[in-house]
Amino acid sequence: MRKIIVVGAVAGGATCASQIRRLDKDSEITIFEKDRDMSFANCGLPYFIGNIVNERKDVLPITPDVFKEKKDITVKTYHEVIAINDKDQTVTVVNRQTNEKFEASYDKLILSPGAGANSLGFDSDYIFTLRNMEDTDAIDQFIDQHQAKKALVVGAGYISLEVLENLYARGLDVTLIHRSEKVNKLMDQDMNQVIFDELDSRHIPYRLNEEIVSVKDHLVTFKSGIQEDFDIIIEGVGTHPHSKFIESSNVALDDKGFVKVNDKFETNIPNIYALGDVITSTYRHVNLPAQVPLAWGAHRGASVIAEQLAGNKNIIFKGFLGTNIVKFFDYTLASVGIKVEELTHFDYQMVELNSGTHAGYYPGNTNVHLRVYFDTNNRHLLRAAAVGKTGVDKRIDVLSMAMMSELTIDELTEFEVAYAPPYSHPKDLVNMIGYKARDL
């Protein structure tokens, strides 16, 4: 019987195991998960903290026992893989509850260990990060047990912004600090102005170019010299791939610790695959490396690996587009394609407009700021970004499909919109981007 070992039981690992079982009823599948829970909805954790999502079962939908019963897949939580012997095809596992070590053999090994939260290194009972359900429970219980009223959020990436909004929704007084002037780095920085506008309109204090110097009990001392008391501190200062244990093997990593994979999610070592936040791949539409630690990529990787193991070798991964979106109070910010700083690899032009999301005479019309970058040599799309209160997601999704299909900026004029006054214009914003580009 073929033995398949999966490292990690969250989005990538659990989904991959489930997809393998769908196509393969016979192999023995075992998942080793170093933490307490499996298959939690990590994208939903901030909303659970904010009581927007009230039911625990909605963010923690399945247990190892149920997974075993329904899918005949063994999940061992609190079991951490600490080493890989790719010559003998074994992994070394430690039971984190008993400290017992043992070896397990595999025919196929799938690495989906995810990423870990970076830490500022301060030793305090008041400081938390948010990466898993255990972190979520700790934050939730701390707020209740200590009747926390005043929170500090450190960092201004999309997770920090979601945490801030949800702490505010829960009734806490929140302050945001960030060590640079660049926030939400997946967006064009000038389009992030709505973030500051939303903070200002709610009188939420924020300071850029600010850092923590020390934490003593409730008292936080900042680089600026300001000292202030907080009941709870949430760090959101980036992540790193959980790949330290992979260094024991011959699996190739890049200089940042990401696992290199091909279009089948194979590593350089036979019978070892990787997916999720731990990998580096390429963009789909341009020849540049890409790390996209988001849910879509993990789920796509799970499907491709399962198909590969089932013998369907023609199903491959064609690369990332990096499509991303975040809600911040009344606004939505989204982008697709390469990062702004990667545009320097190309000769490019930019087209933008700021227009109502649907017919102006129909109630509820709000503006969307839409921006598209294209390569002036072949006129293919490189990047797009949008911000607004409504209609942002569908424009970015359409432009994602356009990039996937290698459409030119001019061909956006041919996009046939689903038009009625409550939804769009006869010439949609995406069409207008194409028309505006004709003279460029």
Curated annotation (Swiss-Prot):
In short, the EC number is 1.8.1.14
Keywords assigned by UniProt, alphabetized? FAD, Flavoprotein, NADP, Oxidoreductase, Redox-active center
Q: Which residues form the active site?
A: C43 (nucleophile), C43 (redox-active)
Q: Which sites bind NADP(+)?
A: 151-166
Specify the superkingdom.
Bacteria
Gene3D superfamilies, A to Z: FAD/NAD(P)-binding domain (3.50.50.60)
Q: State any single GO MF term.
A: NADP binding
* Residues at which FAD binds: 8-33, 267-277, 419
Could you tell me what the cofactor note in this record states? Binds 1 FAD per subunit.
Cofactor(s) this protein requires? FAD
Q: Which is one Pfam family of this protein?
A: Pyr_redox_dim
Give the binding site residues for substrate.
T15, Q19, R22, S39, N42, K71, H299, K427
Q: Which reaction does it catalyse?
A: NADP(+) + 2 CoA = CoA-disulfide + NADPH + H(+)
Q: Which family does it belong to?
A: Belongs to the class-III pyridine nucleotide-disulfide oxidoreductase family.
Q: What else is known?
A: Reduction of disulfides occurs by a thiol-disulfide exchange reaction, but involves only a single catalytic cysteine residue that forms a stable mixed disulfide with CoA during catalysis.
What is the annotated quaternary arrangement, including any partners?
Homodimer.
Domain notes, please? Contains 2 FAD binding domains and a single NADPH binding domain.
Please explain the role this protein plays, according to its UniProt record: Catalyzes specifically the NADPH-dependent reduction of coenzyme A disulfide.
Alphabetized HAMAP family for the sequence: CoA_diS_reduct
Its protein name is Coenzyme A disulfide reductase
